[in-house]
Amino acid sequence: MPYINRVLGPESLGKVEYANSIINYFILLSAIGIPVYGIRQIAKIREDSDLLSKTTVELLCILFITTLSTYILLFFITILGSQFHNYTDLIILMSSMLLLNNLGAEWFFQGIEDQLYITVRYVVVRIITLVLLFILVKAPSDYMMYALIVVLNTVGSNFLNFIKIKNYIKRKHLNFSVLNLKQHIRPTFTIFLASISVSIYLQIDTFLLGYMAGDQYVGYYSVANKLLRYVILFITTIGSVLLPRLSNFWVNDKNMYFSYLQKSFFYFLIISLPASVYFYFFSEEIILLMAGEMFKNSIITLKILSPICFLVAMAYFFGFLILYPQHKERIYSFSVLISAIVCLGLNLLLMNKYQQNGSASAQLVAEFLGVFFMVFFIVKKKMMSNFNLDISNLLKILISVGILIILNILLKYFLYTQKNILGFVISTISFFMVYFFLLFLFKENTIIGVLQSLKKILPTKKNDLLK
């Protein structure tokens, strides 16, 4: 990311991000909620190979129809919309993500929990695209090459998915007469409503910034937003891994469901809270060292966005790990729909005066409202009556974060900190070392559990080596 920020600059980077935001809307439109619905359904029936094959083919057929329809719609909008003419080449190139995203069936492999395949494939594709990035992108004029690499990085691995999924589908005993596409329409549409609402407050800011303020402000906003999204991606990946297992437990073992739910809550909290604090206090160093002086306008933007790490973690916990497994996606849809409407209104109100900072503020409010409404309905409907939160463990995490905040205030305002790469690396390592030391000192359950697991593994490997 630092390399791309410095080579492309705000304007060229903004062009690619603007086109990407447009394509992401069409991806959501064509997917109609199947990526989330598919994970849940596949997780529930993965032991029944015949039903697994039938359900997978049904969902792929729906996706084929919606993808074709979306391409037709995209073609007409690109041709007729004069504001898109300067981005036609980028939109055509990046539209390949529509096909690869939908027919790659990532939801299938998440549903069967083939984590080894997902991880290896992810790492290989990331390494290839990183190498291509340094070889092909050398100047601001290379933004088309960068767009191609974004496509490969985002959905390149889906080539392999399309080949591998054939091994799981029993085609001999499957014909179109037994397929029932209609049964999936209503639940996918409910999830689709939530997905499109979330996308409004994730993508509308970029779209409106490009339309109302210009590519430069999109660049400023994208740098701050992308830095956060790397951490958020880690959080959402944990959520994606846990969703199929919790969906399975909700059907087969309620006690295990609530046990895993409590562990998941503390995992999310341990990661997201210090991340939000870190981005707030280190925003200047992060932007200047990762993007350069030309992106200094992104510093305030990153500060505003920093609490989103925590809010997204809570949204995933309440939405994906409680509401979705319990088939209460309507509550999630309503919550994010209200948030999206508020986000759109705030963007229109704040963007002209505050540009990217107005968009950041709108997104922050939207994320908060989404979590607030989810918690309100979950408590009201007593959906967590069997969830016994360990208050003492929660206090250990909150106290550790509180001490971390106080230490950073003292360091920032009373001591001089060097703003160079070495100082940044040392400060970052020290920040997280102090945090995890505090958790260990207070004997926080999650950290102690991880250390005990490592302790069991290491002696075993040592003994194996001695044999």
Task: Describe the role of every protein-language-model region.
Residues M1, A19-I23, I27, A31-I39, ...:
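Short runs within selected transmembrane alpha-helices of multi-pass transporters and secretion channels
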Residues M1-L13, I135-A139, F192, I196-V231, ...:
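Helix-terminus/linker motif at the lipid-water interface of multi-pass membrane proteins
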Residues P2, A31-E47, L228-F265, S272, ...:
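Helix-loop junctions and terminal segments of transmembrane helices
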Residues P2-Y3, G14-A31, T190, D205-F207, ...:
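Alpha-helical transmembrane segments of polytopic membrane transporters and translocases
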Residues L8-A19, I45-V57, L68-L99, A139-A147, ...:
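Membrane-interface helix-capping segments at transmembrane helix termini in multi-pass transporters
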Residues L28-A31, V36, V57-D89, L93, ...:
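Alpha-helical transmembrane segments of multi-pass membrane transport and lipid-handling proteins
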Residues Y143-A147, F159-L202, V241, R245-S259, ...:
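Interhelical loop/hinge segments that connect adjacent transmembrane helices in multipass membrane
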Residues I409-K467:
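Membrane-proximal transmembrane or re-entrant/amphipathic helices at the cytosolic face
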